[in-house]
Design a protein with these regions (language model features):
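Short, contiguous alpha-helical
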Residues: 1-12, 46-92, 97, 116-119, ...
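Acidic/histidine-rich alpha-helical segments that form the ligand environment
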Residues: 24-36, 93-131, 151
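Short low-complexity stretches enriched in small and charged residues
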Residues: 12-17, 24-31, 72-77, 113-115
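Active-site rim elements
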Residues: 16-20, 103-108, 145-148
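A short secondary-structure junction motif
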Residues: 36, 40-43, 81, 125-128, ...
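Short, contiguous, helix-prone interaction/anchoring segments in small proteins
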Residues: 17-50
Length: 171
């Protein structure tokens, strides 16, 4: 039986070794995300993707929140003289805030904008830039190459939460 928490499996860097493919995944997320929620009703959007999991609405808003943070972390790593220590956040607590009950279109617009800018930034980066790092206080040093791979997976992971829920429910 598939684990609904990880519909595409847990993150494994070996599966995300192509920088070009990872960048394309970042570029493609806005369209893929829109397609994943297209035509869903409010009732469907308020359905958890698994027992005890976020609703589809919360998942869309989480993608916007998380990818804003990642884009900012890229910019910090590219512009600071030393590897910056980034500030983690409580994503589960963010998902409970009132703005996560708003229409998903608000976050789809954010994802459109962030991913357009992120794609432009990725296209401008050199090999050396991708080796720049930031420090996560809980998980240590991350190169931007590794973060790109993680967020390519993250994009596909949460899109799969949406699409697998639709498929399971015949929506």
């Amino acid at each position: 039986m598939n684990d609904a928490r990880y519909p595409i499996g847990k993150f494994d860097t070996a599966n995300y070794s192509s920088r070009a493919e990872n960048a394309r995944t970042i570029s493609d997320l806005p369209a893929n995300l829109r397609a994943a929620v297209d035509g869903l009703t409010d009732e469907q959007l308020d359905t958890p993707y698994r027992d005890g999991g976020w609703t589809l609405r919360q998942t869309v808003h989480h993608l916007a929140d998380s990818h804003i943070n990642s884009f900012c972390r890229f910019k910090l790593a590219l512009t600071e003289d030393e590897a910056p220590t980034i500030r983690p956040y409580y994503e589960d607590r963010w998902a409970e805030l009132a703005d996560n009950r708003m229409p998903v279109d608000t976050s789809l617009k954010i994802v459109d904008g962030i991913h357009s800018r992120w794609t432009s930034l990725l296209e401008s980066m050199t090999d050396e830039d991708f080796q720049r790092e930031f420090v996560h206080p809980e998980t240590g040093n991350w190169t931007l190459e590794a973060v790109l791979a993680l967020y390519a997976w993250h994009s596909q992971h949460h899109t799969a939460h949406l699409t697998s829920t639709r498929e399971r429910n015949g929506w």
